């Protein structure tokens, strides 16, 4: 059984009691269900009845908005991968996913004519490893690559020409590269291409930028946490770095660097998002120019 099929079976399987055929048009409690039996309007061909919503995130757009954006030239899509893992006592397990909320938005707008697919929130790993930390949820390498493959094919089928893969967690990079290479072989001559962009994963450069441009020097405490990570996350969600609780406990500091005042930390986070955006957009444009 292929990973894609196995995943589909897990997602769609229903309890036996739920699979018992019901009376057509009937709902529990005797109400008639007309929504699933009445003819459905072919919305794909209808004119969009409201103004376009301003978002780069596909899941925040209607189908007609996505359709019209593609027709207007937004044929680049970002596939972003994060993870759910141990990040110390202050950062939530979704650290990488929260970073991508900030960087994904910025990269899409900086590149232009670009939409963002739903974030792949789980990273590859061994789900049977006995010492998984509390809260960690991982996919096998095969399943992770199957998800990337299915997402890419879904985007290509509806008209996206350039699929850009970006990973915020180091363990994501190799399987992303492999998935991109396999897809490009399968799509040869089809007018679409996958771009794997390792330049995005540049935390060493971010740390150097932090020291050079912001004058911040961290003294590492041994936690899976850094000032630059906390600052970037703070631009989208201060609860994800546990600001209220840490302020109350007198622990609103990381690696010797105060996170208060929060306005300064957010401003620094925005500068680091801008830095990562510039590097990533340049790398994407360079990859696209090779076609």
Where are these regions (language model features)?
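Bacterial N-terminal signal peptides
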Residues: 3-15
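Extended, histidine- and acidic-residue-enriched regions that form the cofactor-binding/catalytic faces
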Residues: 19-164, 168-291
